[in-house]
């Protein structure tokens, strides 16, 4: 098991005894550069624990909410997204490599023969297929609308004083010391608990053990050397 996952689980164990909401002082992983500090919280509503995770983000006054989300996805290899873009971004799916197995991949329309992966963690859906995507690793965090079950990702903006309001993400810039909460809403389900989000630990890339050989993938050939 990876070191970062062990640290993450240990941290979650200490949090399970607490009921206070996550705060900026809890953040362990800051992404970006700038003079505006914000927090990104994602609550999956998928029954897995911890149910919500938090990142710190530093951006500029003109940085929009969706730009913050995209930056965090591109920087943290454990986090991945599915979006449509038609005059703006629509968030259809968000996922997180919860078990630390580096199996960030999605399938479309049940095609498990050729799962899709993306180096940036950003997957693009279309109006015709956005309900047909599934996460390969069923132990990971993931939620998106499907043909059999509707659902939608909402975004809330919360000030330090605790005021919350739903917000659009494409034009609205981030505000200093605000928390932006993406949570998944599905029919017949309560709003997920995002206040007690767990601050993620920084991603630590394991060193590659070349003594075990190298696996090559080419256009028409693959194998070990």
Model region roles, listed by residue range:
Residues 4-15:
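Sec-dependent N-terminal signal peptides
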Residues 21-224:
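Ubiquitin-like/PB1-type beta-grasp interaction modules and other compact soluble beta-rich domains
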Residues 15-21:
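Sec/Tat signal peptide C-region and signal peptidase I cleavage site
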């Amino acid at each position: 098991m990876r070191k970062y996952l062990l640290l993450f689980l240990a941290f979650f164990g200490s949090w399970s005894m607490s009921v206070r909401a996550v705060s900026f002082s809890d953040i362990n992983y800051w992404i970006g550069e700038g003079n505006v500090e914000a927090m990104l919280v994602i609550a999956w509503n998928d029954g897995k624990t911890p149910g919500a995770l938090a990142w710190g983000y530093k951006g500029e006054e003109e940085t929009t909410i969706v730009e913050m989300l995209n930056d965090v996805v591109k920087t943290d290899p454990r986090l991945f997204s599915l979006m449509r873009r038609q005059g703006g971004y629509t968030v259809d799916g968000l996922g997180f490599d919860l078990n630390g197995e580096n199996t960030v991949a999605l399938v479309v329309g049940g095609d498990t023969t050729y799962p899709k992966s993306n180096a940036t963690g950003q997957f693009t859906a279309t109006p015709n297929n956005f309900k047909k995507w599934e996460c390969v690793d069923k132990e990971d965090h993931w939620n998106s609308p499907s043909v059999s079950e509707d659902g939608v990702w909402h975004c809330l903006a919360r000030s330090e004083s605790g005021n919350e309001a739903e917000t659009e993400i494409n034009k609205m810039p981030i505000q200093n010391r605000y928390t932006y909460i993406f949570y998944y809403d599905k029919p017949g389900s309560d709003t997920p608990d995002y206040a007690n989000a767990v601050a993620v630990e920084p991603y630590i890339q394991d060193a590659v053990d070349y003594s075990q050989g190298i696996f090559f993938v080419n256009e028409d050939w693959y194998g070990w050397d």
